[in-house]
């Protein structure tokens, strides 16, 4: 049996998730002076096939009503990236304006990821 993690996002949540993914990826690549996947640390992960699969899944989800379907290792990458992003970007819960909206969206996204992690869909291999 294989675990599949399914997450449904609103358009606004998915846009926020994609924006975070793009900024994290660009910051990672900028530190390495280029688009080289090998031997690059991506928020603690090697730039490997799981990161590439997450990249592909993000593209597919945009075409599939903002729904992600991830296997365990790819799900782990997404969850780790989002937790680290939240930790590295100090959000003041009393803030107002655009920062407040991102703070709320990041919390919603992390809740959906966490909930999905508790209820994987089991599929035959």
Residue ranges and their predicted role:
Residues 1-125:
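Positively charged, low-complexity terminal tracts
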